[in-house]
Design a protein with these regions (language model features):
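FIC/Doc superfamily catalytic core
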Residues: 1-274
Length: 274
C-alpha cells in the first residue's frame, strides 16, 4: 500500500503543475465533471457520448430533470452533482475557500441530484430522494453482499458520517473506506454507487490528495467493471485482506483518473474539448 500511495502522490504532484491549470483550471474542472458523469453513467448502464453531454452543457438546457432520453437524464443528474462538488472546491489560484457541507448534507444533496430525474419520471417515489433508507422502503439497487436494514443500517451509517468528517485521516484510506461503505451499506434505496463515486471526488479534493479537482476517478470503474465488482466484493467480505485489496483498487482508480486529467488538460489547453 505504501508503494501505491507513493505512486499516487507522484502522479498528483505532476498534475498540479500542469501548464493548463495555471490559468484555465476552471475550464478543466468543468470538463472533468463532464467526463466523470459520462464514465459514471456508463457504470450505471446509462451510456451517453461525452460530445452529447457537452453540447447540452454548452446550451445550458440541463436545468430540467427529465428529457426524452432516460440515459441522458441519468448522466445529467450525475453531472449536476459533479458541478455542485466543483462549487465546494477551493480555488487553485486565489483565496476562495467555500464552506464545506456536513457529511449528512453532502450525501443527501448529491443523492437529490443523482436521483431527482428518477423521481421526476415516476421511477421512484419523491420521498426516497435524499432520504436515508427506512425499514419499510425497498432496496432498488444491488451491490456486494446483503445490505443491512433497520437498526443494523443505523449502526453502520452513523460511523460512516463520522468518518467523512473526522480530521487528520489519511486521504486515500478515507476515500476508499467511505466509497466501500456506501456501496456495501447502501443507505439509500437507489443511486448509492453513483453517489459514492462522487463523494470520492469530493474527499480527495477536500483532503488535498488531488487538489486540482480534475481527476476522472470514475474512469477505471467504467473501463474495468469486473475489477470494480470484484474489489467491492472483497471489501464487503470484511477481511483485512479484502479491505486492503479495495484500498489498492481505489488507488489504481485514482491513478487512472489522474492520467485522464492530464489528457483533458491537454485538450483544454488546445481548445479541443468540444
Amino acid at each position: 500500500m505504501v508503494r501505491a500511495q507513493e505512486a499516487l502522490d507522484e502522479a498528483t504532484a505532476a498534475l498540479r503543475w500542469n501548464e493548463a491549470l495555471r490559468r484555465r483550471w476552471r475550464e478543466a474542472r468543468v470538463e472533468a465533471s463532464v467526463r466523470c458523469a459520462v464514465a459514471s453513467g456508463a457504470v450505471e448502464g446509462a451510456p451517453v457520448p461525452a460530445s452529447l453531454l457537452r453540447g447540452h452543457v454548452a446550451a445550458a438546457d440541463l436545468t430540467r430533470p427529465t428529457s426524452a432520453d432516460p440515459a441522458l437524464d441519468a448522466v445529467a443528474g450525475i453531472w449536476r452533482a459533479g458541478t455542485r462538488l466543483v462549487a465546494w472546491m477551493p480555488d487553485l489560484r486565489g483565496d476562495l475557500r467555500p464552506a464545506q457541507p456536513s457529511a449528512r448534507t453532502l450525501l443527501a444533496t448529491l443523492h437529490r441530484d443523482v436521483t431527482g430525474p428518477l423521481a421526476s419520471a415516476g421511477v421512484i417515489p419523491l420521498g426516497e430522494v435524499g432520504a436515508p433508507r427506512e425499514e419499510a422502503m425497498p432496496l432498488r439497487e444491488g451491490g456486494p453482499g446483503d445490505a443491512p436494514r433497520g437498526g443494523a443500517l443505523a449502526a453502520r451509517l452513523d460511523p460512516l458520517l463520522e468518518l467523512i468528517e473526522a480530521p487528520g485521516l489519511p486521504a486515500l484510506v478515507r476515500a476508499a473506506v467511505v466509497h466501500g461503505e456506501l456501496i456495501t451499506v447502501r443507505p439509500f434505496t437507489s443511486g448509492n454507487a453513483a453517489v459514492a463515486r462522487l463523494v470520492v471526488r469530493h474527499l480527495v479534493t477536500r483532503d488535498g490528495l488531488e487538489p486540482t479537482g480534475t481527476a476522472v476517478a470514475d474512469q477505471y470503474a467504467a473501463q474495468a467493471p469486473g475489477a470494480y465488482s470484484a474489489a467491492a466484493r472483497a471489501y464487503a467480505s470484511g477481511t483485512s485482506q479484502g479491505v486492503t485489496d479495495w484500498i489498492l483498487w481505489q488507488a489504481e482508480a485514482l491513478l487512472v483518473g489522474v492520467t485522464e486529467a492530464q489528457a483533458l488538460c491537454r485538450a483544454v489547453q488546445a481548445g479541443t474539448t468540444a
